[in-house]
Regions:
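Acidic, low-complexity/disordered tracts enriched in E/D and polar residues
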Residues: 2-22, 210-339
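Type-3 copper protein
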Residues: 2-259, 363-694, 870-941
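Short, Φ-rich (hydrophobic/aromatic) sequence segments
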Residues: 174-178, 184-275, 755-816, 820-822, ...
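Segments forming glycine/polar-rich beta-alpha architectures that bind adenosine-containing cofactors
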Residues: 263-273, 277-286, 291-293, 515-526, ...
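Hydrophobic residues embedded in beta-strands of well-ordered beta-sheets
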Residues: 296-297, 383, 741-743
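Short acidic, hydrophobic short linear motifs in intrinsically disordered regions
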Residues: 341-353
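C-terminal structured domains
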Residues: 347, 632-904, 914-932
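Short, basic interhelical loop/turn and adjoining N-cap
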Residues: 355-362
Length: 941
């Protein structure tokens, strides 16, 4: 098919950089990307370094190396003198001298030792004397370290105090760690020349972690990291393939805060818990309910509250097929709803009592039970997934209720709304006041609603920050010339196109999608059709999937002997066997590559490896694969390179979370509209994209603009899209397209295939049962690239094992790394003071030289006795030129058995080309690609 493009579309397609359009028309690179920009320039971190102490340490190491070499030589020259010694006493003295020289230690009595050697070998005695003098010079050199480090540490602490006043750090801390932010001023006022006490050292380490995060990491959060909408375009002054283009960053940043939607959920709980207020709210029956013989069938949706004390929290949503026995009272209720689809709760209770002659309290209890069971719902106060401003939308919903208490509550929300509105333009001091006022106002509202103690999440606001605008005509959009990264046939984008062929082998969800297809065929036969999608989902979970997930979660990919453990394949599906074969092929080839490259800093995956693994996936890999890749471009003379950090399958992932930042008039049209136009252009022929919202909005990570024309409305859900664009679950059926070897979701009303898309930022496993199952029919994927899985580590050197950098063409698939227990790292010497600090800094310098570490790394610590991602700390930046940075790392280590993984900071300072007036910034590009190998129209047979 020929894709249409929209001129302002984030997914407008351009030919793959570095190749002509005719090479592979099935694969395209989106011409728009989202750039993530670290808040502080790297140059700001230089103030924390100890360059003079580093130079001193390097001189010490060079002197030690020279003495070690000469000492070994002299030890050999002393060997015949030991054997020829005239008496036992002289022999023992010479033997001791020989050991001292070999070990680089100063002789016990240097003058006597030189005289002893001179008696039989004057030339060697002269060399020993020179060695002793140089060894004494080393002692003098070692003594220089303590005052140097003390002075530079004081300067570093003074620099740290200055940096702690940076707005982009402080504004982010107000939301990320308000407690720490509140302690920084006290730390700043202390004397940098004085060694901080235990309490202030803890503040210092935490402050350093956030400072390094603001300058070195690219995970968007408030002013720590901004996003900038960009596009690939030829700039007219870039040489092809040299990787030397400088990317100019926007100078103006703007904040876009939103209230944590958990706050609205807590207010709704209080309103619904009050019978008087509940009586005035409109109620509906759960959408999608049906008669099922003598029962009512519907989907029961429930929420489990998250931990309000956590920095990031959300309520867990769940849905289950549920049945209620039909009764006279229930039938009367259904009849009432048939005549009045949306009565108010109190009115419904009254009518139900009048119809059945029941006591009002009894009717109230009955409706309350149905409300808890989810058959009766009050949806008017729910947060809509497409709400750009959830707090205002909640206020508007209250006003629409039309009751005095609701109007008063809506008026009470005016002040919280004003606090949020004033927040973006405020400085740190005013923001601090606004957050405190917001908490007071919301706590007061909760008390007015009857809460004995307010229950508010720790984080009240989440803020996304935009760098520049999204309008290229305004001159503040980011532009990157793809020719600069084309390379000589194997640049990053060309390599990415090839690598995508093997990503299904790493996809965590592919075995689940294959299993679902196998279950369907076992239940409905090849070429079968299921008209009752809700029953299919229920049966799949009840009869198979829940047990399958439990079993799969316990699976370790490799056993204790390093052998691959196949995926659970209870249905004996050959496609799962093919996935296993592809993974084993990758592991076997990486083992062979590793065997030939021990000690190398970098190894390259041959094209034949990718071809072989891709060959195992023939007939298994999806034929329609929109992908999002997170890349960091690296400046290398004549060798353009990019680090591939993450890959996800799906549509619009780089943009969806940030649409509210780009939906203003100054942005040349809303980003949501542009993405939606792109979606329409990218749809497979005969198919439509339809969003799965995931039901209740329990997290700000689920909020985004409307990005598809259609939306799948699951039972129990409500939708804000136009009625004609809603696709209810009972309009859908599943059919086995044997020619294409895939399950196809179709709409009876539209007469077209429906491709489900999830556009939020929650992992699929966090979604309720129905949307999670529908995603097994979508192009959603998660493919963490574990290139070293099943490959044995090399022999350790003093407890340290290392891995080289892994490249495929112009892509870095894995950074260089070093793994060790905390006990193998340089330990703090006994005592405290400048001498101990200098000795420890020197020990780190010596350790880094021994294991060939670069100057800058990221450290990930897993506590002793624990494993898995939940136990690991987030990677912490470590600058080996900074004693303060090393001290912050030391604070993370609690046990000698803690496992520490150090990974090179790539790109490092010399590999960055993104600049602002402030300096050079770490950036990450989130790009989109689309591979479409689909044959046929997707239209119903």
């Amino acid at each position: 098919m020929t894709h249409q493009t929209h001129p302002e579309s984030p997914l407008s397609r351009s030919p793959s950089p570095g190749r002509s359009p005719g090479d592979d028309p099935r694969w395209t690179l989106g011409d728009r990307f989202m750039m993530r920009v670290a808040g502080l320039p790297l140059e700001s971190l230089h103030a924390l370094r100890c360059p003079e102490t580093g130079g001193w340490a390097d001189r010490v190491l060079r002197a030690e190396a020279r003495l070690r070499s000469r000492g070994a030589e002299l030890s050999d020259r002393l060997h015949p003198l030991v054997k020829g010694a005239g008496d036992e006493h002289a022999r023992r003295r010479l033997l001791r001298l020989r050991r001292e020289l070999f070990n680089g230690k100063p002789p016990t009595a240097p003058e006597a030792a030189v005289a002893l050697v001179a008696a039989t070998d004057p030339a060697t005695a002269g060399a020993v004397g020179d060695w002793v003098r140089d060894r004494q010079a080393l002692e003098a050199l070692l003594a220089e370290g303590a005052p140097l480090l003390a002075a530079e540490t004081a300067r570093g602490r003074a620099g740290l105090r200055r940096l702690l006043g940076e707005d982009r750090l402080r504004l982010g801390l107000l939301l990320a760690s308000p407690t720490l932010e509140g302690r920084l001023d006290a730390y700043i006022r202390t004397d940098p020349d004085r060694r901080p006490d235990k309490r202030l050292r803890k503040v210092e380490r935490s402050a350093l972690a956030y400072l390094y995060r603001t300058a070195r990491k690219t995970s968007p959060f408030s002013t720590f990291t901004a996003v900038a909408l960009g596009r690939f375009a030829e700039t007219g002054h870039t040489s092809s393939g040299d990787g030397e283009q400088t990317v100019r960053l926007p100078e103006v940043w703007s904040g876009h805060p939103r209230l944590n939607v958990v706050v609205l959920a807590r207010l709704t709980e209080l309103i619904l818990g009050d019978p008087a207020r509940r009586a005035g709210l409109p109620v509906v029956l759960a959408s999608g309910w049906e008669h099922d013989d003598d029962r009512i069938r519907y989907v029961r949706r429930s929420l489990t509250a998250g931990d309000d004390g956590a920095a990031v929290t959300f309520d867990a949503a769940d849905d289950r097929l549920f049945f209620l026995r039909r009764s006279g009272t229930l039938e009367r209720l259904l009849t009432l709803f048939a005549h009045r689809p949306e009565p108010r709760y109190g009115e419904l209770a009254r009518l139900l009592g009048e119809e059945g002659g029941a006591d009002p309290e009894e009717c109230e209890r009955y409706l309350t039970a149905l409300l808890e069971l989810g058959l009766v719902q009050i949806p008017c106060l729910r947060t809509d997934v497409h709400a750009a401003d959830p707090l205002r939308a909640f206020r508007d919903s209250l006003e629409a209720v039309g009751r005095p208490w609701a109007r008063r509550l809506a008026e009470d929300l005016a002040w919280p709304i004003a606090c949020v509105d004033r927040y973006p333009a405020a400085g740190a001091g005013l923001r601090r006041e606004l957050l405190a006022e917001l908490r007071r106002a919301l706590s007061g509202i909760q008390r007015d609603l009857g809460a004995p103690e307010p229950a508010l999440p720790r984080t009240l606001l989440y803020e996304d920050v935009r760098a520049g605008t999204g309008d290229a005509a305004a001159g503040t959009a980011v532009t990157c010339d793809p020719r600069a990264w084309a390379g000589d046939g194997d640049g990053p984008f060309t390599s990415l196109r090839s690598l995508e062929r093997v990503l299904p082998a790493f996809d965590l969800t592919l075995p689940q999608r294959i299993t679902f297809k196998g279950f369907f065929r076992a239940r409905y036969g090849r070429g079968g059709r299921c008209e009752d999608l809700l029953k299919l989902v229920h049966d799949f979970h009840e009869d198979f999937y829940d047990q399958y997930l439990t079993f799969a979660a316990r699976r370790e990919p490799f056993d204790e002997d390093g052998r691959y453990v196949p995926e659970p394949n209870w249905l004996g599906l050959p496609q799962i066997t093919a996935v296993d074969a592809a993974r084993e092929e990758w592991t076997a080839r990486m083992r062979r590559l590793w065997d030939t490259a021990r000690g190398a800093e970098e190894i390259r995956v041959p094209a034949g490896t990718v071809d072989a693994v891709a060959g195992k996936l023939a007939g298994v890999a999806p034929d329609f694969a929109p992908q999002s890749h997170f890349l960091q471009l690296v400046r290398r003379d004549g060798d353009p390179m990019a680090v591939l950090n993450q890959s996800y399958g799906g549509f619009a992932f780089p943009f969806s979370r940030f649409t509210h930042c780009y939906d203003g008039e100054e942005d040349g049209g809303t980003l949501s509209d542009r993405v939606r136009h792109a979606a329409a252009a990218a749809q497979p022929e005969g198919a439509v994209f339809a969003e799965i919202t995931g039901g209740f909005v329990t997290s700000n990570l689920n909020l985004h603009g409307r990005l598809t024309d259609y939306e799948i409305v699951c039972p129990g859900e409500t939708s804000s899209v136009p009625v004609e664009h809603r696709i209810h679950l009972d309009d859908l059926y599943v059919e086995d397209d044997t020619a294409a070897d895939r399950l196809v979701l179709r709409s009876r009303r539209l007469g077209r295939e429906v491709v489900p898309l999830y556009l939020g930022y929650l992992v699929p496993l966090a979604l309720p049962e129905i949307p999670r199952t529908l995603l097994l029919l979508s192009p959603t994927s998660m493919a963490p690239l574990d290139v070293w899985g099943g490959v044995p580590e090399g022999a350790s050197g003093n407890g340290v094992t290392s891995r080289p950098r892994v490249r495929y063409g112009g892509l870095v698939l894995s950074r260089r790394s070093w793994t060790a227990p905390a006990s193998a790292l340089p330990g703090r010497p006994a005592g405290s003071g400048p001498e101990a600090d200098a000795a420890w800094f020197l020990a780190w310098r010596r350790w880094a030289a021994e294991h060939r570490l670069p100057r800058r790394v990221f450290a990930t610590v897993t506590p002793a006795g624990k494993s898995g991602g939940a136990a690991r700390t987030k990677p912490q930046y470590v600058d080996l030129d900074s004693w303060l940075s090393l001290s912050a790392l030391d604070g993370l280590l609690k046990d000698p058995g803690d496992r520490v993984v150090l990974r090179e900071a790539l790109p490092d300072e010399d590999g960055l080309r993104a600049v602002s007036d402030r300096g050079t910034h770490v950036v990450e590009l989130a790009v989109e690609t689309l591979r479409n190998d689909r044959k046929g129209t997707g239209a119903p047979k």
